[in-house]
From Swiss-Prot:
The lineage of its organism: Archaea, Methanobacteriati, Methanobacteriota, Methanomada group, Methanobacteria. SUPFAM superfamilies: Vng1086c-like (SSF140371). It comes from the Archaea. PANTHER family: UPF0058 PROTEIN MJ1205. InterPro entries: UPF0058, UPF0058_sf. Belongs to the UPF0058 family. It comes from Methanothermobacter thermautotrophicus (strain ATCC 29096 / DSM 1053 / JCM 10044 / NBRC 100330 / Delta H) (Methanobacterium thermoautotrophicum). This is UPF0058 protein MTH_224.
Length: 102
């Protein structure tokens, strides 16, 4: 996926989060995403950073939806997205280490 496509996906997920904000308390689930301080408008950030933000945000959204009463979201979806966020974080850390070594 190209960086501009990732930024568009990131923006879409932010819209989904804003929609969910009206009906749910989202603060706890989104704490990690908010602490990243990476928004879709930060086009200077790397593709890997946006990818990480997308996975963290997707994981938070899935946790919010899983918590909803009567929701049939399987737990493996939430777990899978959390695992993808964890792997993506490792990529960002490696990239930052390479940049610092230069």
């Amino acid at each position: 996926m190209y960086k501009d496509e990732m930024i568009q996906l990131h923006q879409f997920l932010v819209y989904v989060l804003k929609y969910l904000e009206n009906g749910y308390d989202i603060k706890d689930e989104c704490e990690e995403y908010f602490s990243l301080n990476i928004s879709p408008h930060h086009i200077h950030r790397t593709k890997a950073e946006h990818k990480y933000a997308i996975f963290v945000l997707s994981s938070a959204i899935s946790e919010i939806l899983a918590r909803k009463e009567g929701n049939n979201l399987p737990p493996n979806v939430v777990n899978g997205l959390s695992e993808l966020a964890r792997r993506s974080r490792k990529e960002v850390v490696k990239m930052e280490a390479r940049l610092e070594a230069k």
